[in-house]
Amino acid sequence: MSRIITAPHIGIEKLSAISLEELSCGLPERYALPPDGHPVEPHLERLYPTAQSKRSLWDFASPGYTFHGLHRAQDYRRELDTLQSLLTTSQSSELQAAAALLKCQQDDDRLLQIILNLLHKV
């Protein structure tokens, strides 16, 4: 009986990675659920530490921020022109090469638009 009482872990604690600060807290605080109305997703890293590499790849593949405004053609062109002007005014050779690559991409995009318009007319 004394062996069970003095054991440093009970139940699921044995299977999970516990930091020293979490170990200093009592059991209810360690595995407390979020309050009602709050999502469980922010607590996944703490609850399931084994699949962190898969979660980090998923976070990289689906970022929390989105650029919905860039789906509009005018906003996309404006941001692209702003980026190109910033790249061309820089002194770095890498940024100058990026500006040249961006210019080639824009030229290819314009050529594809012309071809698409011609195909549409035919």
UniProtKB/Swiss-Prot annotation:
Keyword hit for Secreted: yes
Cellular component annotations (GO), alphabetically ordered: extracellular region
Keywords, comma-separated and alphabetical: Coiled coil, Plasmid, Secreted
InterPro entries with a match to the protein in the record: T3SS_YscX (IPR012672)
Pfam family, one: Type_III_YscX
Protein's cellular compartments: Secreted
Any coiled-coil regions, as ranges: 71-87
This protein's domain notes: The region between residues 50 and 110, which contains the predicted coiled coil domain, is essential for interaction with YscY.
Subunit comment: Interacts with YscY.
Note: May possess both an mRNA signal and a syc-dependent signal capable of directing its export through the type III secretion system.
Function: Required for Yop secretion.
Annotated protein name in UniProt: Yop proteins translocation protein X
